[in-house]
Amino acid sequence: MGKLKKFLALNRAKKLLLVEAVVALAKGRVMVWLPFSKVAPSLGFHMKETPLAANAEEARKVRQVARAIALMHRHTPWQTHCLARAFAGMNMLQRRGIESTLYLGTGKDENGKMIAHAWLRSGDIYVTGDDVMDQFTVVATYAKAWKTQEEEIVQHEKG
C-alpha cells in the first residue's frame, strides 16, 4: 500500500496529528534559522527542568506526539535535525498544556570535532533525541512550564 493510501486509511484524529507534526516540524526548522537569542525566551525557564512524573493521560499524549514526530520527520521535503524536532515536540506539547524540558548538549565526534545535540523530555518520556543523548554533556536546559508551575520546578531541582 502506498504512503498516500496508508495516510488516507487513517482515522481523522491520526491524520490531524500527523499534519500537526509536519507543521510543527516546519516551524521548528524556521526557529533553528533564527538567532538563538530571539528564540530562547520562548523556550521556558533557563537551566531548570520539569518533574519526571506525569499522569497516565498526559503520558499517552506525549507518546502520540513522540511517534508523530518520529514518523513525519522522515517524510518532510527538508532535513529536520535534532533541534528542530525538539522545538516541534515542545510546540505540540505546549498546545496540549503539557510541560517539557529541552536539553542542549555538546560532545565530540570520532574525529574529536565538537558536535551538538538537542533532545526533549516530558515526564519520564523522551520525546525526541534520546537515541544518542548519552554521548553528550548537557550544557543547557529549558523547562517549558506555566508560570504557576515555577515553584514546582524549583522544588524538583532540590528534591
What do the PLM-derived regions correspond to, one by one?
Residues M1-G159:
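Helix-boundary/low-complexity linker signature
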